[in-house]
Amino acid sequence: MQLTKTQFVRCVFLLLANSKKYTIPQAVRISYRLLDKTRVSLKTKERLLVLLDALESGKITPREFTKRLFLEYPKPSDKVKVLSLKIFE
């Protein structure tokens, strides 16, 4: 199953929001697996890998990571909710 970029971003936000369930290194490892299944350009994958690597190494905090991720992508329209639990629809 191929994920879109929006679905990938939603999954990453949900992983980071569930900090009781997943630690940051676990969330990053899961994000790497999801990124392999994501249908995006190589340039976008490279930018996402740089952000995930910085988060994993501790260079940036999860808050800074989400801020950069939000700045990277345009704001959603009224119909799309970023933190929707219906990820795979």
From Swiss-Prot:
Keywords: Signal. The keyword Signal applies. Residues 1-19 form the signal peptide. This is Uncharacterized protein 37.
